Each structure stands twice: as structure tokens, then as C-alpha cells.
UniProtKB/Swiss-Prot annotation:
Expressed at low levels in roots. The keyword Transcription regulation applies. This is Protein NODULATION SIGNALING PATHWAY 2. Keywords: Nucleus, Transcription, Transcription regulation. Residues 453-526 are annotated as: SAW. Residues 344-450 are annotated as: PFYRE. Plants silencing NSP1 and NSP2 exhibit reduced expression of the strigolactone biosynthetic gene D27, reduced levels of strigolactones and increased shoot tillering. Rice NSP2 is a homolog of Lotus japonicus and Medicago truncatula NSP2 genes, which are transcriptional regulators essential for Nod-factor-induced gene expression. Although rice roots cannot form root nodule symbiosis, rice NSP2 is able to complement a NSP2-deficient mutant in Lotus japonicus. Rice NSP2 is able to complement a NSP2-deficient mutant in Medicago truncatula. A motif (VHIID) lies at residues 252-256. GO terms for molecular function: DNA-binding transcription factor activity; sequence-specific DNA binding. Residues 103-123 are annotated as: Disordered. Residues 221-286 are annotated as: VHIID. It is found in: Nucleus.
Length: 575
């Protein structure tokens, strides 16, 4: 009988992967401040010597890592409208887009702060840009507030569509503001028509975005990886913190709240197998958290297959499994299979404007995951999230300002956020390029629609101002980022265009921004210590149920709740 990954609740072991390691030569890079770092000796997440070189020298750069996870035959296809998807061979043609680094690649700050996109709204026609901005705000006001009028909103949206209609054909003359306004107009129209899941769940949002061809999604994601630091910034920071935390452990278990395409873990695997001290790579086990039902579980399985194939290709001992959220999207620690002796790590990537994941899970779901991983005795928790203007600092009093301002304020917050993303992508993605259009259509447009829908519902709560305050209030403590991690972030930004900034807002947190706008942050935390069971009074017999202390600092759980349901299934090797 053929058994698929969806039928198996356990891990997918790669017993054929030995512990042989490849030792990279130590190489030093100047970070621009006169200090030289021996990257090879410290086994960084990114092999910077190779990352900065071309493929001709045989180096395993990050682009190669990503491309190795994408099958060529998945990048060609036909969309629902009959148009062919972008072929893998076309992705690097010069006539499609240009990779234009800034004149000063080591710079991570800018001397030209201001509101991006709005600085030059329509490339020579600022009046039209201001009109678009005012009409968008008026449409948002017409959809909410004490004087809302759906008919007025409909009239305004008709006018907006007339003003941006030429952007539908990816007209080279369309400005950044016009293209951005077109997507926000569509998002508002979706609210008016009820085509966006205003009152629906995350699964409905996933279904709404599933019509894009899988090859187009992967292609757009890879292009976004190549042309911007949005994904790499959070991934590299989290991975470096994980490497440092588990450097002495022989078995590592990462529970990933939103694995997406699984790209984050390729660089971690490479770092584990290329330690300069010759220590064999630890066994890595990744458990991906998925939603109950169809599409989410299948996407996780595909990510697991790609990661498993990549691990086998570099000799990384690896196994992969998944656990599902409850129907109300709550995380239950009992669904995670625990093995004695593993260093447990929680990875939580949330709310990214430039990502293929368009769904923002409820704050209650995120909170249940963070508290659940603390209850399991996680050694480290990494959090990557969007950075809102309401969170100027973790200790400020402006946490609820965005929510207090209602839909219009939150709508304008999202408009400013995506205008910064648009502006930052312009240097790497010329407006007229096919790749730029693909990224906008497949990634940014669905994310804008989701952001506007969430703002309309006002569902973000504490998630809008970041999780720092909640985690401190729940007993989590900040884990300071190493100097190495800070330097790695600065080097990463040096590979891209001027205008990107990196800012330290706490000992455990760094923020990626574009000019004056904060966009996303990465932070590292340690969960509160597990409570030690109290001893019963002398002479009193008190049975211990499922919480006996163990040497690893965690606790043993009842077999009924935590183990039996997983061990009935055999492990399968994927070839």
C-alpha cells in the first residue's frame, strides 16, 4: 500500500545521511568599520566569501541554495487565464530586470529620509499622485466611520480605477504611486463587493490566493530573495542566534510556526555541515506547524520534501514532521513529538509585507504557540515580524494608537508601509520589468488585500504593536544578539541598494528599514524557566502525573498525551 506524507504523523528520517562534514576555509571580510571577521572559523549562517562571488568559482552561494530547492519543472506552467508562467530560463535575462547595486554597497543608512513613493508620487506629475492619495483616503473614510456611505465609496473607486487603468498592462509609463494605488483600489473594491474574507478565517484567505500557478509563486519568491533583503534579514538573524545557542548540542529540534517554502533552513543546514572545527553536524529535526485541513498541510509536505532533498545533498542528518493547529488555530504542546536529549527551539516568523504567506494568524494563535513552546522547555525563541509605526520602542505608550484611529488610520499605515516596499524594490526591479509585474501580482497584491481586510476588521490587537511587550509580560527574557550577528546584518544590507537601514532597538532586537520607515524586526528570547514540582510533605504519598524533571531541563510528559499517538506510525525514508 502506498503511503503518502499526509498519512504519516511521524518524522521522515534520512538514515542514509551520514555525519560527514565539509570544512570551509576560513575567510575574512572587512565590515566597513575597519574590523576584520574570520567568518569561516565561526561557521556563520551565510558563507559570505562565497555569497559575494559568482557561481563560476564553484561557491555554494545563497542563490544556489534557494535554486537547488526549486525544481525546474515547477517553474513553468499556465495560469488560469491561459498565459504561460515565467520560465526558469528567463529569470536572469538582462532585458527582464537589472540588478543595480548602489554606489556605496557598504552603507546601511541614508541621508535622504522621508516618505517613500510619496516623495515623487508620479515621476513628474505630483498633482496626480496627491489626487490618488486623497481619493484612497476618501474611499477608506466612506467605508467606515460615522458617515460611511457605500455608494460614495463606489463612486470614488470608479474614479480611482479610471486614473490607474493603464497600469493593468504593466505600462512602462505607470509610476510607482499609480501601480501602488491600483492594488489598494482593488483591495478596497474587494471590501465593498465582499470578495475579500472580511469576516472569514485564515483558510478562506489561503483559498482566495491559491489561484496563482505554483511555479509563478516560487519564481516570484526567488526573485524577491535575489533583489531585496526582506527574507534574508530575518532568516539570517534568527539562524545565527540558533547556531550560537545549540553549538554544543548533538540533536536539535526546531518547531517552526510558519515554515512557508522552507527556504530559511537551507542556510542553517549549510552552516551546520561546514564548521571549521570539524565537529560533525548535529541531527536536525524540524516540526512545521500547519492548519487543519487541505491546502496548508499539503504545502508543508512539499516544503518538507524540498528540505529533505537538500539535506541529503549536503550530508545533513535530518528529519521532518508536522503538527496541526486546532480548528480555532490554537497550538497544543501535546501535538509536538518530543525526544529526550534534543535542544528545542521555537521559530516564529510573522506578518511580512514582502512574503508569499498572505495569511496573518490570529493573535490568540501566536500567543498559544509562544506560551506552548515555553511550556515544552524551549531553549530559544526567535521572532521575526513587521514593524509598525505604533511601535517606536517596546516600552512606549503608543501601542494602541493605530487601533484607536480606526480603519482610516490603519489603512494609511498600510499604504505607507507598502509605499516603502515599492520604493525599495524599484532599484532592483525596474517598473517595466516582467519580473516586477510578477512579484506585484503574485506576492504584493494578495498581501495588500489581506492587510486592508485585517485593518477593516481591526483584528490585530497586540499583534499590531509587536510582541515584545507581551513576551516580557509573560516572563520571556531578552537574549542579547552577538556582535557577529549585528555585523552579519550590516554585511547583508551592504549587498543591496543604498537606502536600507539596520537599527538596534534593544539588546535582543534589530530592525530593518527603508529610509525613515521601519519595516520588519528580528528578536531573540529565552522562555521563562519551567516550574520545579514541589516535594510533598514527609509521610504523604503523592503520585506525580507526567511532570518528572529530566536532565535536559525539560519534563517528561504522559505517554497517553504526548507519545502514543506518534509512535504507532513508522518512519519513512524519502529518496
Amino acid at each position: 500500500m502506498e503511503v503518502t506524507m499526509e498519512d504519516v504523523a511521524g518524522d521522515f528520517e534520512f538514515s542514509g545521511c551520514g555525519s560527514t562534514t565539509t570544512t570551509s576555509s576560513a575567510s575574512s571580510l572587512d565590515d566597513g568599520t575597519g574590523m576584520c571577521y574570520a567568518w569561516g572559523e565561526l561557521s556563520p549562517v551565510a558563507d559570505w566569501a562565497n555569497f559575494c562571488c559568482s557561481d563560476d568559482d564553484g561557491g555554494h552561494d545563497l542563490h544556489g541554495l534557494i535554486e537547488s530547492m526549486l525544481c525546474d519543472d515547477t517553474l513553468v506552467g499556465v495560469d488560469d487565464d491561459g498565459q504561460a508562467g515565467l520560465h526558469h530560463a528567463d529569470m536572469f535575462r538582462d532585458d527582464l530586470y537589472c540588478y543595480g547595486n548602489g554606489s556605496n554597497p557598504s552603507s546601511t543608512t541614508t541621508t535622504n529620509p522621508g516618505s517613500p513613493v510619496f516623495d515623487d508620487p508620479t515621476q513628474g506629475c505630483p498633482e496626480k499622485g496627491l489626487r490618488l492619495l486623497h481619493l484612497l483616503m476618501a474611499a477608506a473614510e466612506a467605508l467606515s466611520g460615522p458617515h460611511k456611505s457605500r455608494e460614495l465609496a463606489r463612486v470614488i473607486l470608479v474614479r480611482l480605477k479610471e486614473m490607474v487603468s493603464h497600469t493593468a498592462s504593466a505600462n512602462a509609463a505607470a509610476s510607482n504611486m499609480e501601480r501602488l494605488a491600483a492594488h489598494f483600489t482593488d483591495a478596497l473594491q474587494g471590501l465593498l463587493d465582499g470578495s475579500h474574507p472580511v469576516g472569514g478565517s485564515g483558510r478562506q484567505a489561503a483559498a482566495a490566493a491559491s489561484h496563482h500557478h505554483a511555479g509563478d509563486v516560487l519564481t516570484a519568491f526567488q526573485m524577491l530573495q535575489d533583489m531585496s533583503p526582506y527574507m534574508k534579514f530575518g532568516h539570517f538573524t534568527a539562524n545565527q542566534a540558533i547556531l550560537e545557542a545549540v553549538s554544543g548540542d548533538r540533536r536539535v529540534h526546531i518547531v517552526d510556526y510558519d515554515i512557508a517554502e522552507g527556504i530559511q533552513w537551507a542556510s542553517l543546514m549549510q552552516a551546520m555541515t561546514s564548521r571549521a572545527d570539524g565537529v560533525p553536524a548535529p541531527h536536525l529535526r524540524i516540526t512545521a506547524v500547519s492548519r487543519s485541513g487541505g491546502g496548508g498541510a499539503r504545502a508543508v509536505q512539499e516544503a518538507g520534501r524540498r528540505l529533505s532533498a537538500f539535506a541529503a545533498s549536503i550530508g545533513q542528518p535530518f528529519s521532518f514532521g508536522q503538527c496541526r493547529l486546532d480548528s480555532d488555530e490554537r497550538f497544543r504542546p501535546a501535538t509536538v513529538r518530543m525526544v529526550k536529549g534534543e535542544a528545542l527551539v521555537a521559530n516564529c516568523v510573522l506578518h511580512q509585507a514582502a512574503a508569499t504567506t498572505t495569511i496573518r494568524r490570529p493573535t490568540g494563535s501566536v500567543a498559544s504557540f509562544l506560551s506552548g513552546m515555553a511550556a515544552l522547555g524551549a531553549k530559544l525563541v526567535t521572532v521575526v515580524e513587521e514593524e509598525g509605526e505604533a511601535e517606536k520602542d517596546d516600552d512606549g505608550d503608543s501601542a494602541g494608537d493605530a487601533a484607536a484611529g480606526g480603519f482610516v488610520r490603519q489603512f494609511m499605515e498600510e499604504l505607507h508601509r507598502y509605499s516603502a516596499v515599492w520604493d525599495s524594490l524599484e532599484a532592483g526591479f525596474p517598473t517595466q520589468s516582467r519580473v516586477r509585474g510578477l512579484v506585484e501580482r503574485v506576492i504584493l497584491a494578495p498581501n495588500i488585500a489581506g492587510a486592508v481586510s485585517r485593518a477593516y476588521r481591526g483584528v490585530d490587537g497586540e499583534g499590531r504593536c509587536g510582541w515584545g511587550q507581551w513576551m516580557r509580560g509573560s516572563g520571556f527574557t531578552a537574549v542579547p544578539l552577538s556582535c557577529f550577528n549585528h555585523s552579519q546584518a550590516r554585511l547583508l544590507l551592504g549587498l543591496f541598494n543604498d537606502g536600507y537601514t539596520v537599527e538596534e532597538t534593544g539588546p535582543n532586537k534589530i530592525v530593518l528599514g527603508w529610509k525613515a520607515r521601519r519595516l520588519m524586526s528580528a528578536s531573540v528570547w529565552a522562555p521563562p524557566p519551567l516550574p520545579v514540582p514541589s516535594s510533598p510533605p514527609e509521610g504523604v504519598c503523592q503520585p506525580v502525573v507526567g511532570m518528572a524533571p529530566v536532565a535536559t531541563g525539560g519534563f517528561a510528559r504522559t505517554e497517553f498525551d504526548y507519545i502514543d499517538s506518534f509512535l504507532v506510525e513508522p518512519a519513512y525514508a524519502l529518496v
